[in-house]
């Protein structure tokens, strides 16, 4: 029984140990799971791998930077080599240019020294590389002793440029110092004011050793006198002002001299004609001469004399303008008629004249001419002798100052029954052109004053010269055969204004219908007596009607 009992006891102990081991293993396995709950191994592995990747990227970036820097360094080295080659080529060119001017390079001596050193080198292999490098370097010459004066002028050798051998002309000239004689030396005169001001010095400004104020100027202002003295600046300003005045005077003199030199005769004549204060211009009609008659002193007040001033001036103009040299009988009859009609005219009739006949109430406008009379200079008028029987004019129902209506007559359209043959062989008489009798001196300007006396009334009347009578056949033949008188002398522009316009040539014939229409407006049955009546009636108004008639009957 002992054998079976031992077997079961051993089996029981084995089962207990297995149970203990299984419980222990379960406990250990449970404890390990609790320890790795906060951080799992996969997480740790991922973090470790990410750290490795970051380190790898940093290493790659640093490596790239190193490569780029190496490339830049290599490019810089290449540029330095190229620059070295270029500088060497430039140095060779400079040496060649210097050699043309006598420069001797020193590289031959260096090459000979290098060759001697290479021949003297021992061929031992035990020599260290440092000693070999030291032997390869050229032996430097000992620097010259620096015993020169530090205050001397700098030389090219001080900067290592003595081998360029620059020309000696650039060096400053060496002047030998002259021995100084103590007798010839004079003390330097210090600057002093011409009139120094004695000013009491304050205790702070008191000087004991030096009294030299050569660099200090008071400019005329001090504690004692706070006013500006006449110092150098004011004198300089006055001097400049005088110079400017002299310059302006010289410029004005030069300008005057230049104007006098460049002045032409026209400028000189204009300068002589011009006055500082010219009188107002006098307007007059050429050919209209006004004769001033001797005045008769009449008793009376000055006011009445001034009141009659306008009437007297009108009568004076009428008397002056009628003083013409005319030998025709018709003109003499007009003059006699004018003398007969003058006494009947009074002050009221003159003052009631129309505006183109009245001279106005201005007393300063004495001897003011009437509107100009346009006549043909040099053309004599021949009138036929008429009977001296005076025809009484008809009474006008309207205003006496109103001129009669002009008669529209075209004399050149009248048919002349007696046709005259024109003899071309006979020379046409040249009209006598005399301009001097029309162009005479104008009357002097008379100013209004208390001493002025009204001129006496004269028995003359102004009138327009009558137009010469020309037959129709003569004028037509003249224009037909283009027979023209000789050309008159040259006239000025002012005389051309008074010249009667020339009748144009008629190139087209007027038809019978037009002549019949025009004949209705022409009063061909009027007798000579009626014409003389109209002329005499218009003479009292300055013969305005005759002017209109002449304008309408003018042969264009």
Curated annotation (Swiss-Prot):
Residues 118-134 have a biased composition (Basic and acidic residues). GO terms for molecular function: microtubule binding. Keywords: Cell cycle, Cell division, Centromere, Chromosome, Cytoplasm, Cytoskeleton, Kinetochore, Microtubule, Mitosis. Residues 105-135 are annotated as: Disordered. It is found in: Cytoplasm, Cytoskeleton, Spindle; Chromosome, Centromere, Kinetochore. Belongs to the SKA3 family. This is SKA complex subunit 3. It comes from Xenopus laevis (African clawed frog).
């Amino acid at each position: 029984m002992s054998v079976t009992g031992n077997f079961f006891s051993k089996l029981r102990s084995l089962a207990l140990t297995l149970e203990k081991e299984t419980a222990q293993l379960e406990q250990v396995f449970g404890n390990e799971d609790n320890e790795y709950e906060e951080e799992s191994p996969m997480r740790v592995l991922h973090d470790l791998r990410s750290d490795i990747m970051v380190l790898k990227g940093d290493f790659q970036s640093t490596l790239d930077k190193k490569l780029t820097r190496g490339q830049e360094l290599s490019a810089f080295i290449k540029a330095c080599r190229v620059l070295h080659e270029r500088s060497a080529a430039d140095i060779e060119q400079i040496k060649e240019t210097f050699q043309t001017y006598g420069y001797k390079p020193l590289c031959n001596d260096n090459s000979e020294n290098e060759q001697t050193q290479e021949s003297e080198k021992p061929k031992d292999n035990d020599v260290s590389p440092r000693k070999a490098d030291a032997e390869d370097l050229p032996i430097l010459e000992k620097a010259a002793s620096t015993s020169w004066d530090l205050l001397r002028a700098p030389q090219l050798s001080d900067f290592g440029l003595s081998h360029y051998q620059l020309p000696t002309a650039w060096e400053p000239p060496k002047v030998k110092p002259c021995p100084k004689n103590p007798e010839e030396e004079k003390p330097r005169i210090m600057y002093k004011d011409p009139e120094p001001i004695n000013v009491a010095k304050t205790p702070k400004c008191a000087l004991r050793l030096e009294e030299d104020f050569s660099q200090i100027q008071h400019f005329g202002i001090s504690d004692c006198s706070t006013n500006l003295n006449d110092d150098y600046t004011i004198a300089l300003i006055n001097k400049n002002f005088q110079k400017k005045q002299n310059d302006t005077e010289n410029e004005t003199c030069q300008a005057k001299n230049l104007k006098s030199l460049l002045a032409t005769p026209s400028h000189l004549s204009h300068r002589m004609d011009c006055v500082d204060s010219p009188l107002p211009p006098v307007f007059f009609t050429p050919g209209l001469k006004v004769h001033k008659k001797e005045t008769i002193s009449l008793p009376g007040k000055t006011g009445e004399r001034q009141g009659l001033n306008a009437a007297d001036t009108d009568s004076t103009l009428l008397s002056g303008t009628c003083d013409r040299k005319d030998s025709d009988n018709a003109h003499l009859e007009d003059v006699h008629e004018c003398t007969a009609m003058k006494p009947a005219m009074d002050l009221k009739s003159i003052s009631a004249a129309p505006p183109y006949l009245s001279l106005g109430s201005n007393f300063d406008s004495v001897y003011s001419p009437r509107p100009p009379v346009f006549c043909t200079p040099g053309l004599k008028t021949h009138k036929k002798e008429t009977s001296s029987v005076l025809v009484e004019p008809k009474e006008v129902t309207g205003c006496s100052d109103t001129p009669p209506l002009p008669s529209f007559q075209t004399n050149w359209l009248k048919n002349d029954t007696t046709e005259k043959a024109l003899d071309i062989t006979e020379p046409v008489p040249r009209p006598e052109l005399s301009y001097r009798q029309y162009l005479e001196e104008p009357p002097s300007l008379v100013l209004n004053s208390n001493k002025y006396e009204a001129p006496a009334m004269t028995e003359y009347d102004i009138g327009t010269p009558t137009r010469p009578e020309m037959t129709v056949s003569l004028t037509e033949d003249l224009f037909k055969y283009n027979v023209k008188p000789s050309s008159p002398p040259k006239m000025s522009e002012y005389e051309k204004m008074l010249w009667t316009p020339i009748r144009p040539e008629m190139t087209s014939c007027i038809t019978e219908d037009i002549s019949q229409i025009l004949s209705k407006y022409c009063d061909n049955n009027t007798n000579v007596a009626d014409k003389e009546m109209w002329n005499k009636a218009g003479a009292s108004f300055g013969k305005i009607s005759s002017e209109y008639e002449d304008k309408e009957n003018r042969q264009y």
